[in-house]
Amino acid sequence: MNDNDRSGVVRFADAKGRIPTPSGERAVLTLKRGTLDVKLSIPVPPNRQTPHDQDEIYFVISGHGVLVHGGKRDPFRAGDLLFVAAGVDHHYEDFGGDLALWRVFYGPSGGEIPLAGQ
């Protein structure tokens, strides 16, 4: 779905069938509208990420792991929702091959509420 679509359904099975991509990517774009960017992500260890320009939400579909963020370690499992503000260093640890997440970027560059000191 994209900016021209007014509504619709994004199907997990359809998106999962596109992973890995021909270039080996473990995430596929499923919805793009304005600042909203939704991908299905099925990561493999080790999980390397850099801080992002937008706020980010993860909906954990399956699996479990640990979100390492801002000097903290928070365990998560299927059904949980994770939030990472723009600019926060983060990654996953202690997860297996069954981890699947909807990854949602949204809002302006720098986040809805900028980090203190920025």
Question: Locations of the language-model features?
Answer:
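A short, N-terminal "cap"/entry segment at the start of jelly-roll beta-barrel domains
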Residues: 1-49, 116-118
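Short strand-coil-strand connectors
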Residues: 32-34, 68-72, 95
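Structural motif
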Residues: 35, 57, 64-66, 89, ...
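Short, isolated positions in well-ordered beta-strands
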Residues: 37-38, 74, 90
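Short hydrophobic/aromatic-rich beta-strand segments that constitute the beta-sheet cores
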Residues: 38, 67-69, 101
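Short, conserved beta-strand element in jelly-roll/cupin
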Residues: 52-67, 107
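Short acidic-glycine-tyrosine-enriched beta hairpin
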Residues: 71-86
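Ligand-binding loop in jelly-roll beta-barrel domains
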Residues: 86-112
